[in-house]
Amino acid sequence: KELAQTLDTDCEIYACDLSDGKSCIKLERKLSKRNDIFVFINNAGFGDIGDFERTSLSKDISMLNVNVRATHILTKYMLRSFKKMNRGYIMNVASSAGLLPGGPYMATYYATKSYVTSLTTSINGELKAAHSNVHICMLCPGPVDTNFNNTAGVTFALPGISAEYCASYALLQMFKGKVTIVPTFTMKAAVIASKLAPRELAAAITAKQQMKKRKDNKH
């Protein structure tokens, strides 16, 4: 509500627990009945850091529910709605993590974002083959100055970009028809380098970066 008051446009607020599958379905049933929505952005998600066997299982499951299940449900419903209208844009906010082979010490988070990038790439292929006017894309940023750090318990080794810049850049690229959106040159270079290196080597390099993020710094 506080955010809505700062905007010039009219806002409608829907309360939804995205970690609950039934709540996601109820939300999408409401949204899919409308014909005045043509941009949908899956932006919810969170991470956690630590050795895989030591991280909280309940937090892992909640992360899977929000990052994977909710994204899957919301994307499917909005895609159906947009295809009926033969127009619309869907942006799935993934991460540069989803373009890398793996992320030791953030194993679950990296796996969830790999799901998002794979799903989005596959749906894009289907839409292109059908010559659809619906466009789907994925935003894969590196560090962004949001509350993600506190939730995940990390301190980024690289400087983050502002949320405002990330959002404006992402929307501009989406409307240009870009499918994979990586906002900064540094992350673009890192993604390209990881694809050239063997998977195990790329994961080992990522592990070193993850260790720099850990606030507990146990290793």
What does each of the following model-derived ranges do?
Residues 15-26, 57:
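The beta1-alpha1 cofactor-binding region of Rossmann-like NAD(H)/NADP(H)-dependent oxidoreductases
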Residues 43-48:
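Conserved NAD(P)H cofactor-binding loop of Rossmann-fold oxidoreductase domains
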Residues 75, 112:
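Active-site helix of classical SDR
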Residues 95:
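Residue(s) in the substrate-gating loop at a strand-loop-helix junction
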Residues 101-110:
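Active-site loop-to-helix junction immediately N-terminal to the catalytic Tyr of the SDR YXXXK motif
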Residues 138, 155-191, 195:
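C-terminal helical subdomain
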